């Protein structure tokens, strides 16, 4: 498998409730469109799914980049009509942060300290 095929992205999706609809109307729409079977599409994993009171739901998926359009189509097919949507493609910063922290500590121990921005 190529390294490109193994790469994934994170996609955070804000599903903002249409507040003109009550919960029963929202759930009815989602059931009628097959939301619970269709989303997320095969190959996309749920990294987190949270309810934010007064806003709606925030879903973060981990998926290969080639599935981005599939996720978009499923949102259009199933969620539109009860949710306004916003999408935020992201990446996992943990490894980068850990590397930067190690480099900073090493520079500090050597007395050179981290590079400081110029005023």
Predicted regions and their residues:
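A short linear hydrophobic-aromatic micro-motif
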Residues: 42-49, 84
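Short, compact, well-ordered microdomains
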Residues: 66, 71-77, 82
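Conserved short beta-strand edge segments in small beta-sheet-based binding/regulatory domains
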Residues: 79-92
């Amino acid at each position: 498998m190529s390294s490109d095929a193994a790469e994934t992205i994170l996609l955070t999706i804000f599903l903002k409730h249409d507040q003109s609809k009550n919960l029963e109307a929202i759930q009815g729409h989602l059931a009628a469109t097959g939301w619970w079977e269709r989303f997320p599409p095969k190959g996309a994993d749920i990294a987190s799914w949270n309810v934010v009171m007064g806003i709606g739901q925030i879903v973060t998926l981990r998926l290969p980049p080639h599935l981005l359009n599939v996720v978009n189509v499923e949102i259009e097919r199933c969620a539109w009509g009860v949710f306004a949507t916003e999408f935020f493609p992201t990446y996992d910063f943990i490894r980068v942060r850990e590397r930067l922290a190690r480099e900073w500590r090493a520079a500090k121990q050597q007395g050179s300290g981290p590079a400081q921005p110029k005023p």
